[in-house]
Swiss-Prot record:
Full protein name: Interleukin-5
Family: Belongs to the IL-5 family.
Primary location group: secreted
Signal peptide: 1-17
Length: 132
């Protein structure tokens, strides 16, 4: 009797934790609002120089974006709502890192690779800014 009860409690705790997990899209929206709200505070130190990618395809410049974020975080007074902003940005970085881990998952047949390549090129042709 104890084991089924423990399993039920464990299952209930897992369902509750999943239900409370905030979707990443909500975190991104909240972060955009916080970024707009605290922009003056974040730009108050005019001597800080941050790497700004010249490439318009943001997907290719994630490393540089988060490098600049770390510099900004270290140069900004901590506490309050700004702390929440940096926590959200940290969550977004962790999410992106987890997604990047899926890039080399398994080997497949040539047809499946070509299907993936075709989908990738389709996204590239519609969503990326093409430079001369």
């Amino acid at each position: 009797m104890r084991l089924p009860l423990q399993l039920s409690i464990l299952t209930l705790a897992w369902v509750w934790a999943v239900a409370l997990e905030i979707p990443m899209s909500a975190v991104v929206k909240e972060t955009l609002i916080q970024l707009s709200t605290h922009r003056a505070l974040l730009t108050s130190n005019e001597t800080v120089r941050l790497p700004v990618p010249t490439h318009k395809n943001h997907q290719l410049c994630i490393g540089e974006i988060f490098q600049g974020l770390d510099i900004l975080k270290n140069q900004t007074a901590r506490g309050g709502a700004v702390e929440t902003l940096f926590q959200n940005l940290s969550l977004i970085k962790k999410y992106i890192d987890r997604q990047k881990e899926k890039c080399g998952e398994e080997r497949r047949r040539a047809r499946q690779f070509l299907d993936y390549l075709q989908e990738f090129l389709g996204v590239m042709s519609t969503e990326w800014t093409m430079e001369g």
